[in-house]
From Swiss-Prot:
Record EC number: 2.7.1.50
Bridged cysteine pairs (disulfide): none
The UniProt record lists the keyword Transmembrane helix: no
Gene3D superfamilies in alphabetical order: 3.40.1190.20
Binding site for substrate: M39, G187
Reaction(s) catalysed by this chain's protein: 5-(2-hydroxyethyl)-4-methylthiazole + ATP = 4-methyl-5-(2-phosphooxyethyl)-thiazole + ADP + H(+)
One Pfam family in the UniProt entry: HK
Gene coding for it: thiM1
Membrane-traversing stretches: none
Keywords, in A-Z order: ATP-binding, Kinase, Magnesium, Metal-binding, Nucleotide-binding, Thiamine biosynthesis, Transferase
Identification of the protein by name: Hydroxyethylthiazole kinase 1
Listed cofactors: Mg(2+)
Statement: the UniProt record of this protein carries the keyword Metal-binding: yes
Amino acid sequence: MTSLKLLKKKAPLVICITNDVVKNFTANGLVALGASPAMSEFPADLEDLLKYAGGLLINIGTLTDENWKLYQAALKIAEKYNVPAVLDPVACGAGEYRKKVADDLINNYKLAAIRGNAGEIASLVGIDVASKGVDSAGVDNIDEIALAANEKFNIPIVVTGEVDAIAVNGEVVTIHNGSAMMPKVIGTGCLLGAVVASFIGLEKGQELKSLETAMLVYNIAGEMAEKRPNGHLPGTFKVEFINALYEITDEDVKEFKRVK
């Protein structure tokens, strides 16, 4: 069974502790894809929900001291119930505080994967690239950045940009699909973190396969959305992207995938 079919069959509960700007978009995107999102932010509630969850997303976009404590509590509970947790270290290269939080979560808690743009992941491993907060483009060595992070942290890494790279156990693949409209809609990267959290726990020992499918589904859905009437406009693209996540099939992935 393909990873996409498995996701739709299991409809995993995915707990999303994400930033305030993107909660609605993230929830709708996961529902369209076939997962079951919950945007819980209270430790006692997390204790109840994570027992049944298939994944946890920690997105540090809306960062406060209290949220830092929440991330820590959620990761402790996730480890207790063996729930795979994905970290999206939003803008961790933009300042010392964000970097400190990201380093703490990576070094002191169990993570199943890290998803970030080239600038974010590069900052975690001490590689200099040109980036601006949550935006990163035109990076040529994205596969090297992914491999460096995978080697340093010994967990799967997803690095996004004009080309995306996935590194698992020292092996790297690059994804050459995607839409230029994605950076023009706030929250597309954050939703991707939740999609990664939806796929990462589907098949133990098959993380590279699951992550490759997650990236292909996401990026090809973006291509489909851009090709639709007025898909070149951000407002229309946002709606059509959700529609494409709902409609995309394994046949679409097989026909349009560009992987190296």
